[in-house]
Amino acid sequence: ETCRHLVGPDTTIISVLNGITSEEVLSQAFGSEKVVWCVAQKMSAVKVGNQATISPFGDLALGVPAGADPARLHALTALLDRIHMDYELPEDIRRHMWSKLMVNTGCNQTAMVFECGYGGLRQPEAKRIMVGAMREVMAVANAQGIPLTEEDLQGWVHVMEEFPADGEPSMRQDGKAHRKSEVELFSGTIRRLGAIHHIPTPINDWLYRKI
């Protein structure tokens, strides 16, 4: 609402928030034709005060739903090309967003509960919880018609193993700074959809309660 007066007929909007709900909220507020779907991914950022240290820098995954006009997507990628900002164009952006939700639900929440960084997530018990939470997301995604696979899950595990051991997911940083977390976007979403599809989500239930 604070930016509504800045949005005109030619404005294109992307959301770099995690989860799978922000595009729907923006589309309802401003019109789906203005929204290019986006996933910010593959970065490890540590924020201290007003400074951020980012390594790796990551990129944006961009797309529009099947059947939507790609004109704004093409204009956006032309801009990113001009400023040399990395991006990728997944074949199915909705599936890609669910894939990112899967890794966030696992790694971010587990890091917050275990009070650890990426190195700690490689320890057996933390990794068991992280991967278990991700598998529950996969089951819910499949029920929603999103074909996530074990290969997708293991691909994300490999990506996280490449992050610095002393790096920290954003929810771990939120916990240390006593900021409101993204738990409703992650296990909150999976628990709600799991209940609709009668899919048990015991690990996400536990993470939700702990957080």
Where are these regions (language model features)?
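Short amphipathic alpha-helical interaction/hinge segments
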Residues: 46, 113-114, 164, 168
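Short glycine/serine/threonine-biased micro-segments
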Residues: 17, 56, 61, 175-176, ...
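Rossmann-like NAD(P)(H) cofactor-binding subdomain of soluble oxidoreductases
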Residues: 1-51
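Internal alpha-helical scaffold of NAD(P)-dependent oxidoreductase catalytic cores
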Residues: 5-6, 28-34, 49-151
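NAD(P)-dependent Rossmann-like dehydrogenase/reductase catalytic/cofactor-binding core
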Residues: 71, 81, 131-211
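Glycine-rich beta-alpha junction loops
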Residues: 18-20, 39-44, 66-68, 93-97, ...
